[in-house]
A protein has these predicted regions:
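Nucleotide 5′-phosphate-binding alpha/beta core
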Residues: 1-63, 69-103, 110, 149, ...
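Short, solvent-exposed polar/charged micro-motifs at secondary-structure junctions
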Residues: 41-44, 114-116, 219-221
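Basic, gly/Ser/Thr/Pro-rich low-complexity segments located predominantly at protein N termini
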Residues: 71-74, 113, 194, 218
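Loop/helix-junction capping segments adjacent to catalytic residues or to phosphate/diphosphate-binding pockets
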Residues: 82, 113-114, 141, 194
Length: 229
């Protein structure tokens, strides 16, 4: 599989094809002969990293969170996107008895409502996906009760999102003596610290699942009910 990947990159990825055309004396079959890739190279000319067998406008445009530095724009084929979602359903959600038909909520930074808005809703609901999308940009002490009302109205079974945003919402609920029970809370994009986990578990009366992964789809890991990764 590695050799197939190296062969494809050498012949079909413009960035690497240009590299190996210049250094023909080196064997591309040996991984140690490949150049170390840095983010600046990708951000400078992202089109050089798209397989020539694909049309950029027919690919899914994603981006990294920038947890370790500069975020990246990525282009992913739709088969890989489907596999990614299937893996998440099977490996993460199913372990916590979360069905693919369960309504769910996500906290993210998409601007689903104007940033200056001071009155609800601070969310949108996707009926096709049974998804409640909550804006991370409006979570504050003055809006906590509004978020709780949205959770009660749409009754999601799990919550996914940025660790810090979920922690902030959990803390607000605790300060107002409120609890909203879920099957699980799944954190992403940021590390999960013990003090955050304690508040999230208390506010949502459920286990917290920490995930580690990359939008680049290089690797993925998550915590299991037994506490192991």
């Amino acid at each position: 599989r590695l050799q197939e990947t190296l062969y494809n990159a050498r012949n079909n990825i413009p960035y690497y094809k240009n590299y190996w055309d210049e250094f023909r004396g080196k064997k591309y079959e040996l991984l140690e002969n490949w150049p170390i890739l840095v983010k600046e190279d990708i951000n400078k000319c992202p089109e050089l990293f798209i397989d020539k067998n694909y049309n950029r406008f027919q690919l899914f445009n994603d981006h990294t969170s920038g947890t370790t530095g500069t975020p990246l724009d990525l282009y992913i084929d739709y088969d890989s996107v489907k596999e990614q979602y299937a893996l998440f359903e099977a490996r993460v959600k199913r372990k916590y008895n979360i069905s693919i038909t369960d309504p769910w909520a996500i906290i993210g930074s998409q601007r689903v409502t104007p940033i200056a808005r001071k009155k609800p809703p601070f969310w949108v609901y996707n009926f096709a996906s049974r998804q409640l999308y909550l804006s991370s940009l409006h979570i504050a002490s003055w809006s906590g009760k509004d978020y709780l009302c949205a959770l009660k109205k749409y009754q999601p079974k799990c919550l996914i999102g940025y660790t810090q945003s979920i922690y902030e919402l959990a803390t607000i609920l605790i300060e107002n003596n409120e609890i909203f029970s879920l099957k699980a809370v799944i954190t992403n994009a940021e590390p999960l610290f013990d003090y955050q986990k304690i508040n999230i578990e208390k506010a949502f009366d459920c286990p917290v699942v920490e995930t580690f992964g990359q939008a680049e789809l290089v690797a993925f890991a998550n915590s299991f009910p037994d506490g192991k990764l």
